[in-house]
Regions:
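Short, structured coil segments at secondary-structure junctions
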Residues: 24, 131-133
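Hydrophobic positions on the alpha1 helix immediately C-terminal to the Walker A/P-loop
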Residues: 16
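ATP-dependent small-molecule kinase phosphotransfer cores
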Residues: 33-113
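Post-Walker A helix-loop "phosphate-sensing" segment adjacent to the P-loop in P-loop NTPases
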Residues: 22-29
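Hydrophobic anchor at the beta1->P-loop junction of P-loop NTPases
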Residues: 5, 117
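Small-molecule kinase domains that catalyze NTP-dependent phosphoryl transfer to phosphate-bearing small molecules
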Residues: 6-9, 104, 127-131, 139-188
């Protein structure tokens, strides 16, 4: 069985994944694992910190890396921004929209384990899990963000096409990245 989890930052996706791993012996995987491996190698950042599973790691990912910011002349460069930009604009848009799906499929193709994927962020990831016979759930905690209705409107207006680029342009004023909004309004 494959279970995919969607939700906003801090909604409890990792808590549910931990529950499935610890009590039901699921194998934990993520679409972004390969991305985080590559970014850790290129930038010399701690792989565990890139995961962002602790408060300290989440805070660290939001901090400007002074060496890289100066070296690349990008004063606001943070690990989180690199993960979002490299994962979405560079690899998904610049190479192939399904790159992270294919990477995980390749990793799992001979596995018989029950798997939980706690980082579903795009409609094509949700479709891939469903196509593989899995289920996708949304975790909600607290009120919807201020940009939620705008994201639903933008995403549904694309008639099921990949909408991450459109979402990013339309929602820029809210300061959220497409990886946080692309799944909003998707049928589970």
């Amino acid at each position: 069985m494959i279970i995919g989890i969607c939700g906003f930052i801090g909604s409890g996706k990792d808590t549910i994944a931990d529950y499935l791993v610890n009590l039901h012996h699921f194998r934990r995987e993520s679409f972004a694992a390969t991305l985080k491996d590559a970014v850790a190698q290129v930038f010399g950042w701690d792989r565990t910190m890139l995961e962002g599973r602790t408060k300290q790691a989440r805070e660290w990912r939001e901090q400007v890396d002074p060496w890289w910011a100066e070296r690349l002349h990008m004063p606001t460069l943070t690990p989180r921004w690199i993960l979002q930009y490299w994962g979405t604009e560079v690899c998904r848009a610049g190479f192939h929209d399904d790159i992270w799906i294919a990477s995980l499929e390749n990793k799992l193709r001979h596995s018989q384990d029950d798997v939980v994927i706690s980082d579903c962020r795009f409609p094509n990831e949700i479709r891939a899990i469903k196509k593989a016979g899995g289920r996708v759930i949304r975790v909600a905690r607290g009120p919807e963000p201020a940009w939620y209705d705008a994201a639903v409107s933008v995403n549904r207006g694309a008639n099921g096409n990949s909408t991450w680029a459109l979402s990013q342009r339309k929602l820029e004023k809210f300061g959220v990245h497409a990886s946080e909004t692309a799944w909003v309004g998707t049928e589970f």
